[in-house]
């Protein structure tokens, strides 16, 4: 049987047009396994994002503060190409890369206006999973 042609099977990838946003929001989601940094405009449309896995860390190294630092730097550099200079930071989750990611946003040249913790806390909602016994 002859191999099927892949013509038209792939998606067309085009570069996003350059936005001109001066003030944005940096959303840092830091879990026990990974850190994801998204930089959005004030309406919530994503300008740039990066995660520890996307930057090149795999497995348990994704959960380190250094991986969070590298992810925040990568997201900040891409956001600066779109004109972002100031950010308000929203941190979510209990992970180890929270403070490191905020510091690296400042180190790359973004001016941090405010920092808010938006970790969701249940008002006694769902029953949590049973405790791990190792």
UniProtKB/Swiss-Prot annotation:
Gene that encodes the chain: rpsK
Q: Where is the composition biased (Basic residues)?
A: 9-21
**Protein name listed in UniProt:** Small ribosomal subunit protein uS11
Q: Ribosomal protein as a keyword? A: yes
Return the similarity comment: Belongs to the universal ribosomal protein uS11 family.
InterPro entries, per the entry: Ribosomal_uS11, Ribosomal_uS11_bac-type, Ribosomal_uS11_CS, Ribosomal_uS11_sf
- Region ranges (Disordered): 1-21
| Keywords, comma-separated and alphabetical | Ribonucleoprotein, Ribosomal protein, RNA-binding, rRNA-binding
Among the GO biological process terms of this entry, one is:
translation
This protein's assembly is summarised as: Part of the 30S ribosomal subunit. Interacts with proteins S7 and S18. Binds to IF-3.
UniProt GO cellular component terms? ribonucleoprotein complex; ribosome
Q: What task does this protein carry out?
A: Located on the platform of the 30S subunit, it bridges several disparate RNA helices of the 16S rRNA. Forms part of the Shine-Dalgarno cleft in the 70S ribosome.
Protein origin, superkingdom: Bacteria
Q: Name one GO molecular function term.
A: structural constituent of ribosome
Return the HAMAP family for the record. Answer: Ribosomal_uS11
């Amino acid at each position: 049987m002859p191999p099927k042609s892949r013509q038209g099977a792939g998606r067309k990838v085009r570069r996003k047009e350059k936005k001109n946003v001066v003030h944005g929001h940096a959303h840092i989601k830091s879990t026990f396994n990974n850190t994801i940094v998204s930089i959005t405009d004030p309406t919530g449309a994503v300008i740039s994002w990066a995660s520890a896995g996307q930057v090149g860390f795999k497995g348990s190294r994704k959960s380190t503060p250094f991986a969070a630092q590298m992810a925040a730097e990568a997201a900040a550099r891409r956001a600066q190409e779109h004109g972002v200079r100031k950010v308000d930071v929203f941190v979510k989750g209990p992970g180890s890369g929270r403070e490191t990611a905020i510091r690296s946003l400042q180190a790359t040249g973004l001016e941090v206006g405010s920092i808010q913790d938006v970790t969701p806390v249940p008002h006694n909602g769902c029953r949590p999973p049973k405790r791990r016994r190792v």
